[in-house]
A protein has these predicted regions:
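Signature aromatic-anchored transmembrane alpha helix within multi-pass, membrane-resident enzymes
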Residues: 1-5, 137-141, 170, 175-189
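Internal alpha-helical transmembrane segments
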Residues: 1-17
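Transmembrane alpha-helices and membrane-interface helical segments
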Residues: 121-129, 144-145, 165-182
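Hydrophobic/aromatic-rich transmembrane helices and adjacent perimembrane loops
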Residues: 113-116, 150, 156-177
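Membrane-proximal stem/loop segments at transmembrane-domain junctions that anchor or position
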Residues: 12-89
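Membrane-interface anchor segments at the N-terminal boundary of transmembrane helices
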Residues: 68, 74-140
């Protein structure tokens, strides 16, 4: 708590609200609205859109974000099946790679293949760890279920996966080491 108190105080002084994050409504709207395709639509962000930046400056951050959240919630209520379909797409993009997000478009399929392969191996490792009742496996399950959930509602980006990649790496190493044991190729370290 001592680490975040200065940030809470800063936000209260600057924004009038003691919050850790204040931009959820704007992010929700970027991912949900007319033309939404499950990806980050940067052209709707105030830093990329002159009209949105003007609104942001006129209203202030808290009012702007609240307005964008109302727009997103209205869209979700109006077409909930579409929102669910977008959430499913974002789930696929989070674990399989976001399309068209490479600076070199020809590399995007390769990049996404590696992204997807690492996810499949991590899920496989998690499944094996749970079946074998490995200590801590349930913690990894809850991490993998809970951490990315918000990105299924807004939009995925490869950097949003970085915080859990060490755990995914552990699961990948686990499944590979289990495969080595099964083949009889285990060596003494």
């Amino acid at each position: 708590m001592a680490c975040i108190t200065p940030w809470l105080a800063r936000n209260y002084r600057t924004l009038g609200v003691p919050s850790l994050r204040s931009n959820f409504g704007a992010e929700l709207r970027i991912g949900n609205g007319p033309g939404a395709d499950g990806t980050w639509r940067e052209y709707l962000h105030p830093t990329q859109n002159v009209y949105q930046m003007r609104r942001y400056q006129q209203l202030g951050e808290i009012a702007y974000v609240a307005g964008r959240e109302r727009e997103a919630v209205a869209f979700i209520r109006e077409d909930f099946p579409r929102f669910l379909a977008l959430c499913l797409k974002r789930f696929v993009y989070y674990w399989g790679g976001v399309p068209r997000l490479s600076e070199i478009p020809a590399l995007a399929p390769i990049k996404n293949s590696v992204f997807l392969a690492s996810s499949v191996l991590a899920f496989w490792g998690l499944g094996r760890a749970l079946r074998k009742r490995q200590p801590g496996a349930w913690l990894l399950l809850w991490l993998i279920l809970s951490y990315p959930a918000v990105y299924y509602a807004v939009f995925p980006h490869p950097r949003y996966r970085h915080p859990i990649e060490p755990e995914l790496g552990i699961l990948i190493v686990y499944v590979i080491s289990e495969a080595q044991k099964k083949k009889g190729g285990q060596t003494e370290a």
